């Protein structure tokens, strides 16, 4: 299984980098992981709705340029469907029956463009709260790792 995570925004804190490295190492037993980090666009103070949409489109174009072909695309967005860890594990297992590559997309601070969302086969939400993209990357990798542990009937703390 190949897993790609495309994320807008740079990881700045060392503790997030350490957590991402740890989960990347753990995941290597189950899947080939590729993390693509894209620069976010500058957001002017008091940006208009039009400027916000233009920024989301620019970031979206960068995402689409990096999107692997023939990959099952999952976008992380607040309006997506919430899953328990067990449900996400089942979803990943089901996807692996028809696709050898899953791409998870994390948008920038303004979210994802409608164009990117339209490319997704699954819109996934981790709840209604807004989380920083740096933390979201850690949470996503932990949940993917947990899903593989569940799917392989291996114990993992609850």
Go through each PLM region and give its residues.
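Conserved beta-strand scaffold positions in the cores of enzyme catalytic domains, especially
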Residues: 35, 73-75, 123
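N-terminal beta1-alpha1 ligand-phosphate binding loop
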Residues: 1-27
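A generic structural motif
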Residues: 28-34, 71
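A mid-sequence interfacial segment
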Residues: 86-127
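Short glycine-rich anion-binding loops that position phosphate/pyrophosphate groups of nucleotides
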Residues: 11, 78-81, 108-111
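S-adenosyl-L-methionine/SAH cofactor-binding core of RNA-modifying enzymes
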Residues: 39-100
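General small-molecule cofactor/ligand-binding pocket signal
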Residues: 6, 34-36
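Structured adenosyl-cofactor binding patch, chiefly the S-adenosyl-L-methionine
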Residues: 114-158
């Amino acid at each position: 299984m190949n897993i790609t995570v495309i994320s807008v925004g740079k990881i700045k804190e060392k503790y997030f980098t350490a957590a991402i490295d740890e989960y990347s190492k753990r995941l290597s037993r189950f899947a080939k992981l590729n993390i693509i980090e894209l620069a976010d666009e500058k957001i002017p103070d008091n940006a208009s709705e039009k400027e916000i949409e233009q920024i989301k489109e620019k970031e979206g174009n960068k995402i689409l340029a990096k999107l692997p072909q023939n990959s099952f695309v999952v976008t992380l967005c607040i309006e997506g469907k919430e899953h328990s860890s067990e449900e996400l594990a089942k979803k990943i297992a089901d996807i692996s029956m028809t696709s050898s590559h899953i791409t998870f997309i994390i948008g920038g601070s303004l979210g994802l463009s409608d164009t990117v969302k339209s490319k997704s086969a699954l819109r996934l939400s981790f709840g209604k709260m807004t989380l920083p993209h740096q933390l979201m990357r850690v949470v996503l990798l932990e949940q993917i790792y947990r899903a593989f542990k569940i799917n392989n009937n291996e114990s993992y703390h609850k």
